[in-house]
Curated annotation (Swiss-Prot):
Family recorded in the similarity comment: Belongs to the radical SAM superfamily. Lipoyl synthase family.
A GO cellular component annotation in the UniProt record: cytoplasm
InterPro entries: Aldolase_TIM (IPR013785), Elp3/MiaA/NifB-like_rSAM (IPR006638), Lipoyl_synth (IPR003698), rSAM (IPR007197)
Stretches assigned to the Radical SAM core domain: 85-303
CDD domains from the UniProt entry: Radical_SAM
GO MF, one annotated term: metal ion binding
Keyword rRNA-binding listed: no
Disulfide bonds: none
Gene: lipA
Binding-site list for [4Fe-4S] cluster 1: C74, C79, C85, S314
Name of the protein: Lipoyl synthase
EC number: 2.8.1.8
Alphabetical list of Pfam families matching this protein: Radical_SAM
Length: 332
């Protein structure tokens, strides 16, 4: 795992270091859209975050991750649920480094020139999962637009190593869009498909230019549709954030688009800005509205919908999968 210089302030041409991990203002100063800050909204009472506690496994998990040179999206993306998840001994592993080739202004994962892939990472990951005796794991990654296969081969290596050491573990992958490489990536994933295939749409198509520069709404939908055609028995999953400026009607349309493309599982959660340099929160969605989204999801035919302010794509992912009908594997 790399330990690059972390830069948070805007850099001049003279001080710009392409090898540094850029965060916050440094990361977002070069995106093609300008992040306009408005009034900072007060967090409502229903937004509550659980902190890590020394009496739980929080610090044990952090130590194990460092010893095995592993990253988690929980840490890199500043997930508000990290205290609860680490405290219960769960984590979402982030492979292929800690520097993303994209600069999405809602995301706190660092940007920069990625390091070469770590050939030892799949085995280190598999050994860690085996040592922790995890029954369900989520593997995600940074975007790796620099790789000819988008990183799909590395995903497959990780899946294979995990299944060798932990054959009873269910594997969910949260993949990038493999922009321009989707057919190649899906062909590679055919050799060792996951148990759950997740790719997040994140927001309504109207907001893609602002929130997901470099990504395409229809491309993301088609990625999951193509995967489902190849693996009809593997559940597909996607997630949406609310609070970026979308309307309720736009969220409902995204949900319907998901169902029209064969997506089985859904997550919807409240967007929380990682810093004042990121896209601002434009509304806090009331619990009653989340309840409406959940009810509509089941009416549309989703096998499971995890909907609520603090829901994230990987939050209680095992419970989401079980509720959608994904069974635990027998230990061998």
């Amino acid at each position: 795992m790399s330990t690059p210089e972390v830069v948070r302030e805007v850099q001049s041409l003279e001080t710009y270091n392409p090898l540094a991990k850029q965060k916050a203002a440094a990361k977002l100063s070069r995106i093609p859209v300008k992040v306009v800050q408005g009034e900072i909204l007060k967090k409502p009472d229903w937004i509550r975050v659980k902190a890590g506690s020394p009496s739980t496994r929080f610090y044990e998990i952090k130590q194990i991750l460092r010893e095995n040179k592993l990253n988690t999206v929980c840490e890199e993306a500043s997930c508000p649920n990290i205290g609860e998840c680490f405290g219960k001994g769960t984590a979402t592993f982030m492979i292929m480094g800690d520097k993303c080739t994209r600069r999405c202004p809602f995301c706190d994962v660092g940007h920069g020139r990625p390091d070469p892939l770590d050939a030892d990472e799949p085995l280190n990951l598999a050994r860690t999962i085996a040592a922790l005796k995890l029954k369900y794991v989520v593997i995600t990654s940074v975007d790796r637009d620099d790789l000819r296969d988008g990183g799909s081969g590395h995903f497959v290596e990780c899946i294979q190593r995990i299944r060798e050491l932990s054959p009873g573990t269910t594997i969910e992958v949260l993949v990038p869009d493999f922009r321009g490489r989707d057919d190649r990536a899906l062909e590679i994933l055919k050799t060792s498909p996951p148990d759950v295939m997740n790719h997040n749409l994140e927001t309504a198509p109207r907001l893609y230019k602002e929130a997901r520069p470099g990504s395409d709404y229809q491309f993301s939908l088609n990625l999951l549709k193509k995967f489902k055609a190849l693996h009809p028995d593997v559940p597909t999953k996607s997630g949406i954030m609310v609070g970026l400026g979308e309307t309720d009607e736009e969220i409902l349309q995204v949900m319907q688009d998901m169902r029209d493309h064969g997506i089985n599982m859904l997550t919807i959660g409240q967007y929380l800005a990682p810093s004042t340099s990121h896209l601002p929160v434009r509304r806090y969605v009331h619990p009653d509205t989340f309840k409406m989204f959940e009810e509509k999801a089941y009416e549309m035919g989703f096998s499971h919908a995890a909907v609520g302010a603090m829901v994230r794509s990987s939050y209680h992912a095992d419970q989401q999968a079980h509720a959608a009908g994904v069974s635990d594997k027998p230990a061998e």
